Amino acid sequence: MPWWSKSKDEKKKTNKESIIDAFNRKLGFASEDRSSGRSRKSRRRRDEIVSERGAISRLPSRSPSPSTRVSRCQSFAERSPAVPLPRPIVRPHVTSTDSGMNGSQRPGLDANLKPSWLPLPKPHGATSIPDNTGAEPDFATASVSSGSSVGDIPSDSLLSPLASDCENGNRTPVNISSRDQSMHSNKNSAEMFKPVPNKNRILSASPRRRPLGTHVKNLQIPQRDLVLCSAPDSLLSSPSRSPMRSFIPDQVSNHGLLISKPYSDVSLLGSGQCSSPGSGYNSGNNSIGGDMATQLFWPQSRCSPECSPVPSPRMTSPGPSSRIQSGAVTPLHPRAGGSTTGSPTRRLDDNRQQSHRLPLPPLLISNTCPFSPTYSAATSPSVPRSPARAEATVSPGSRWKKGRLLGMGSFGHVYLGFNSESGEMCAMKEVTLCSDDPKSRESAQQLGQEISVLSRLRHQNIVQYYGSETVDDKLYIYLEYVSGGSIYKLLQEYGQFGENAIRNYTQQILSGLAYLHAKNTVHRDIKGANILVDPHGRVKVADFGMAKHITAQSGPLSFKGSPYWMAPEVIKNSNGSNLAVDIWSLGCTVLEMATTKPPWSQYEGVPAMFKIGNSKELPDIPDHLSEEGKDFVRKCLQRNPANRPTAAQLLDHAFVRNVMPMERPIVSGEPAEAMNVASSTMRSLDIGHARSLPCLDSEDATNYQQKGLKHGSGFSISQSPRNMSCPISPVGSPIFHSHSPHISGRRSPSPISSPHALSGSSTPLTGCGGAIPFHHQRQTTVNFLHEGIGSSRSPGSGGNFYTNSFFQEPSRQQDRSRSSPRTPPHVFWDNNGSIQPGYNWNKDNQPVLSDHVSQQLLSEHLKLKSLDLRPGFSTPGSTNRGP
């Protein structure tokens, strides 16, 4: 269909003046006589017209008479070039020449047409129009109008995109009508002007679409000349309005039209989405000029005012990364296929670039700092702090510096703190204070409650409180740092504990709970994750955020705690003994240590709570637990809190009664002082050169301590410290595997060392660089045991043997070493405080070692007849000799 059908003369008369007035108003035409008539001759020769450049004009068809169309065309030719034109689209002076071309000249165009870029018109002059030949004779020109309607007919809505004036923001209608006055077609105007379908607003993938009608045949645009991108470096279109610029390739093969004048309605680049800020990702045609047939001639596609109707020059696109890094985006004015030096287009570009720098659109860009002021990296769970990164001092008056993240809880984060002045370490619990955040207020309340409780507690099995402070919007609490981690962590890494470890840990937890309950304080969150273990096997009860001081007026406990460790009365929120909730949680923790999982862990959420609160049955108790352990668990998991024993009563239970505490032996008097000197010296052996003596089996040592020493000079259990057992390691500790094949020197040393039993290593080392070589140590221990316990050679005189037989004078010891390979070398103290082998003995130190060290070694090994004396590590003859 044409742009309009044959219109009635009456309708054309009514629209004539409105069209002329609109053109005079927007194009600055001086008067109405620019619309003079044109020759009737043009109507008869319309089939032979060849336009050098221009577009199909729709105004002549609206004229009531042919003379009006001729006069209008002549008025364009007679227009004075001195008339000022609006910018940036400059109205060129249109001249008409008789090209004299005919249809026979078309093959020359197809074969010899070379690419060249046509310049834009100069600001106040008409572009020179060369007498080009080779245009298709049956191609008619058409007028182009802006988006603002010139007339009242509906066809005004099917016009080319708006020409955006970069200087004043006004829309300037552009009417480019290059018509040969001497050559016109005789075809009917209704057949000449056909509207382009509305689908042309959307990019078409087919280059065969003909926007101007059926007269443009086989339009093909070479892709190599049209790679013009508005945003070549980004998938995002340019968010700014591009300056109006026409890039028309000269080589358009097989179209029969040689254009010598730029067209304002030619959009080589950009899709119907154009480059508006909200367009998002455009199609590929916007980036690489894919469908140039529909983009070259776009007479009816209407873009938004934010869109540029002409191709945007190649520029750095403000994409997701360049938006932040670059300033205002300015065009660079390159031509895709080359440029004409000194062309008006270049001058226009330079002028526009100086007068109108394209601003960046407002962007929602986050702060440069990745963390908000109230939510720093220290509180971000997704960005844990590296151990190597230590923040500056928390505050100018604080002693502690925050280090790596140790863990995260429901009420804050825990960091490692270090005092660079004293070298101390602590655990820093941090909570961000935010008054309008309910979670922050609750966290601060829990931390304040923990401070109030811990500040009144001093116990070896309760984590120690150092202090607290508020820095900016954060509250810090400084606690004792327990490097071994929690029971939960150990269970996850090493599996379930042995019963000896369970006994030992349970006894220490009970000790802390008894102290806590004596102060009428309930913990309310006893579980493996809140029980810490240090490297020496000492247990610390931690996390008192839910602890509560019980008073006489206290009502039922609030619903706080972990569901799997929660007592039934807490779930049902019933009245009862408040302190007994910790006893129930302790029983659940014992099962957790034995099975790595809390009771009723097969249920989740509400079913688990229903099972705990209403079920009459006890959870499953593992069979490998002893009867004492099973009975202990049953007493703790009594549903009636009144039937549960107290923590002080459970300390007398057989399951924990015989467990030796993890305390270092402390006895009064000179022997204790000497014993501490000897034990500390033995622990200070240089591990880099040699290993200590093999670790002794603490089970036998314990049995010996209970029975007492029966021979010798009255040396009994009362003379030695009672707590002689090694601290318990939860996994792989030698004490729990006394009958395993890996014992004595063959066993790897436990990370937990005893003050009295020296852990050993199976790696023999040579040399005496400040330490005892391994074979000397083992030979000393083995021979001393053989000589002191039932050996063929009895000691000389009872008590004198214990004080003098181990440390003898050099002459006697040399004789003994020659006669028996079991004879140990002498031991003496060097200046560094370590034990050295040799034969020079200082008698001033003899009482210390002879009276205490030798007695200790003898007393601990009287019962160790099953000690693994491996032949590979002892001297010949020593292992063949019976005790």
Swiss-Prot record:
Keyword field: ATP-binding, Cell membrane, Cytoplasm, Developmental protein, Growth regulation, Kinase, Membrane, Nucleotide-binding, Transferase
Activity regulation comment: Contains an N-terminal autoinhibitory domain.
Highest rank taxon of the organism: Eukaryota
Signal peptide range in chain numbering: none
GO CC annotation: cell cortex; plasma membrane
Extent of Polar residues compositional bias: 94-105, 167-189, 314-328
The keyword RNA-binding is annotated on this UniProt entry: no
Compartment list: Cytoplasm, Cell cortex; Cell membrane
BP GO annotations: inflorescence development; stomatal complex morphogenesis; suspensor development
Phenotype when the gene is knocked out: Severely dwarf plants that rarely survive on soil, small rosettes, compact leaves, extremely compressed shoots, and short, sterile flowers. No proper elongation of the zygote and differentiation of the extra-embryonic suspensor. Excess of stomata in leaves.
Location of the Protein kinase domain: 400-656
Classification via InterPro entries: Kinase-like_dom_sf, MAP_kinase_kinase_kinase, Prot_kinase_dom, Protein_kinase_ATP_BS
One example GO MF annotation: protein serine kinase activity
Cited CDD domains: STKc_MEKK1_plant
Protein name in UniProt: Mitogen-activated protein kinase kinase kinase YODA
Organism: Arabidopsis thaliana (Mouse-ear cress)
